[in-house]
Amino acid sequence: RAAALLAWYDRHRRDLPWRALPGEAADPYRVWLSEIMLQQTRVTAVKPYFSGFLARWPNVGLLAEASGEEVMRAWAGLGYYSRARNLHACAKIVAGPLNGKFPDTEAGLQCLPGIGPYTAAAIAAIAFGRRAAAVDGNAERVFARLHAIETPLPAARSEIKAKAQEMVPAERPGDFAQAVMDLGATVCAPKLPACDICPLLKFCRGHALGCPESMPRKTPRRERPLRLGAAFFVRRRDGAVLVRARPETGLLGGMTELPGTAWETNFDAASAASQAPVKASYRKLERSVSHAFTHFGLRLDIYVAEVANTRRAPKCYRFVPDCGLDREALPSVMRKIIEAVRQNATSPRKRGEGRGSEKQKRSHRSC
């Protein structure tokens, strides 16, 4: 089975920027960087971020020397921001106490920030040729179907891991890990798997039973709760926008955000205006912004106000030129809010307010 899969991989392997070419040794730094970025994130989303990081920090030493703010800004938009903090912390350990060398075992890798069992197995196999079973969502699907595992996830994970470990070959374990990833991503898809071109077809018990699409079995998910809140887009007449930094720990730790209320399931919309960061005449946009986090959904009302250029930022806040917002470490939900304001045809900036509006235009042109 492993031989059949590797033969297929040699013909159909995906061309990904972090993969070594056939016959070349894998670069542990590239493997590690890509695996951290790929955690719960699609390949298409990761590619530009991987290329950007590699161009800016081509080795772990340079990444370790970067400031935390620089790393967070470069990561902004990729999501799951604790990964960026752990990435930077890991780089400092590898570049410092470990003298620039990553551990080459699963156990050693798991001692580093941000590296769990799957990521450790993937790095150990791909970068160091260890006989490790890297089982992500794609691999779970492949092995659950291959062995017709009836136990639903997440309870089935230990059984799937054991089956995967049995199949990992002593030769080319890294290619085997990537072959399983590619098979799950391109052939053994969640819906309408292309069984007729699968290299493991004759070994697949799920296909033999006629129900591969129903595997892996899954325990019904609980409905994700919805939290509500409000965001305040406060802009001076020169175009600068009021922002603040979130606390270093917790959700979106260390990122830049627009001022706003707490996010609550029992949010009182009538009290939103009283929680504004500065006194001003606020206008509520007709549209709200929705965003999905891992454990809850979020919907935010947006309040917009324009203030004088002489207005000072309250404590813990700062004004950033509108043209500089894209360079801030803004999470996706904040970027959605900014885009909603920019698209709103009746915003103060688009309405125009005499000389103040003209100053704003000059400010944007000068950025």
Regions found by a protein language model. Name each.
Residues R1-A20, A185-R351, R355-C367:
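Intrinsically disordered, low-complexity, charged terminal extensions of DNA damage-control enzymes
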